[in-house]
Amino acid sequence: MGRSRESKGVILEELKTSLSEAQLTMVIDYQGLTVAEISNLRRKLRPTGTICKVTKNTLMGLAIAEDSGWEPMKSLLSGTSAFLLVKEDIGGAFKAYQEFKKESKKTELRGGVLKEGTKGQLLTEEQLKAIADLPSKEQLIAQVAGAINAIATKLARSINEVPASLARAVDAVARQEEKEAA
């Protein structure tokens, strides 16, 4: 038995809400995956702020129809589709999917759409991999913090070196005067 019009409306609103929070959507072909495998994929994606939605292409088509940023996704809506809606860590989500794909060997990435404001860009698997290879937000923050810390450390050493140099110079002059006096 099919879903009622009301339940489809609820699903459609959930999809629209999820899409509005996502910055990237990856579309995968999930044919052949078991419920346990899909649950495993969801578990791997959860720490990256990504949700996996399995829904009919027609419902996803209706959900993206009102948002021009997701329009490029229309070309990916065919066959059995699962949608990986990435809210936070794009690189981490792609790596988690790649790890799952390597384990299951049953899924295929059709592509993705990166939403930038009101525009969306269709991405191939190679382009998604290039994005995933970029450092994560946490790694960039750590690199910047490390650079700032290094500058502060060098500055502190330089400031401490001035009095130490002065003390060594005074000591050298005092020793010189002692030698001359003796």
UniProtKB/Swiss-Prot annotation:
UniProt cross-references to InterPro entries, sorted A to Z: Ribosomal_uL10 (IPR001790), Ribosomal_uL10-like_sf (IPR043141), Ribosomal_uL10_bac (IPR022973), Ribosomal_uL10_bac_type (IPR047865), Ribosomal_uL10_CS_bac (IPR002363)
Supply one GO molecular-function term: structural constituent of ribosome
What is the name of the protein in this document?
Answer: Large ribosomal subunit protein uL10
Which is a GO BP term held by this UniProt record?
translation
> A Pfam family in this protein?
Ribosomal_L10
Task: Give the gene name.
Answer: rplJ
Top-level taxon of origin: Bacteria
Q: Which family does it belong to?
A: Belongs to the universal ribosomal protein uL10 family.
